[in-house]
Amino acid sequence: MLKNKILATTLSVSLLAPLANPLLENAKAANDTEDIGKGNDVEIIKRTEDKTSNKWGVTQNIQFDFVKDKKYNKDALILKMQGFISSRTTYYNYKNTNHIKSMRWPFQYNIGLKTNDKYVSLINYLPKNKIESTNVSQTLGYNIGGNFQSAPSLGGNGSFNYSKSISYTQQNYVSEVEQQNSKSVLWGVKANSFATESGQKSAFDSDLFVGYKPHSKDPRDYFVPDSELPPLVQSGFNPSFIATVSHEKGSSDTSEFEITYGRNMDVTHAIKRSTHYGNSYLDGHRVHNAFKNRNYTVKYEVNWKTHEIKVKGQN
């Protein structure tokens, strides 16, 4: 991905007017403004910032859309949070034993935004409610005067002057808001239920992902093959979330936002046991939230006047 990509767009108030998106690598904030119409215009100024951490196995792709509306008495910013969170699923021998193999896997993916700026307030976000569907598609729309609304799907943006959409896949997982107030929002994308060869299993089932090869020396063989694992366990998760904030005009020139991507990891132990007749089998034992908040947090500084984005820190 290109770093520090900057896109500047002026949006007419005409419904769903097409956007021009010139890509300017390493450019500065746009210096000129084009007014369209008779003073009832909305200007959308776009910035994009990419940050990757090999340590945490996370890439953040954050789109910052500044909404400059002459009929709205506040600054507004739409943050679209995309990227990739690796599953970091791992198989290993438990404490060097020969009869216990372990699988560490993501029970939950974490996505969050927070600010401590007293002049900034969270005014909208997507998704809002608990969502169990495999495919998630929603739209945030903006109408002149500071009116933000959400639509249930990508096709529901016909009545907006400007819109921003999210779309992601969460097979066998559910999305829900864990925390939300005027300064922050935190989502959890959590394991739900899984179709297995022995039937439907809860995400809390102690035998979930336990395999059928008790005589193998390879830890991987104690668990089901990749073909039976959903993408969010086998590879990772591609988030697509939106938060909208307002800022008091004439107050601070800059605000800081902390954006967090990460995961909570469960550990499933597959234990080799023997029956009374000497037959071997695998018995599952589960440790829920064995590793919590394995998160990558980046602090971004937003300049409300120049519309520049700076990375101020990361863990």
Swiss-Prot record:
Highest taxon above the source species: Bacteria
Family: Belongs to the aerolysin family.
InterPro entries documented for this protein: Bi-component_toxin_staph, Leukocidin/Hemolysin_toxin, Leukocidin/porin_MspA_sf
Statement: the UniProt record of this protein carries the keyword Signal: yes
Annotated Pfam families: Leukocidin (PF07968)
Gene Ontology molecular function, alphabetical: toxin activity
SUPFAM superfamilies: Leukocidin-like
Protein name: Gamma-hemolysin component C
GN (gene name): hlgC
GO cellular component terms given for this protein: extracellular region
Gene3D superfamilies per UniProt: Leukocidin/porin MspA
Function comment: Toxin that seems to act by forming pores in the membrane of the cell. Has a hemolytic and a leucotoxic activity.
Organism taxonomic ancestry: Bacteria, Bacillati, Bacillota, Bacilli, Bacillales
The UniProt record lists the keyword Signal: yes
Subunit structure: Toxicity requires sequential binding and synergistic association of a class S and a class F component which form heterooligomeric complexes. HlgC (class S) associates with HlgB (class F) thus forming an CB toxin.
Disulfide cysteine pairs (residue numbers): none
Originating species: Staphylococcus aureus (strain MRSA252)
Range of residues in the leader sequence: 1-29
Gene Ontology terms: biological process: cytolysis in another organism
Keyword annotations: Cytolysis, Hemolysis, Signal, Toxin, Virulence
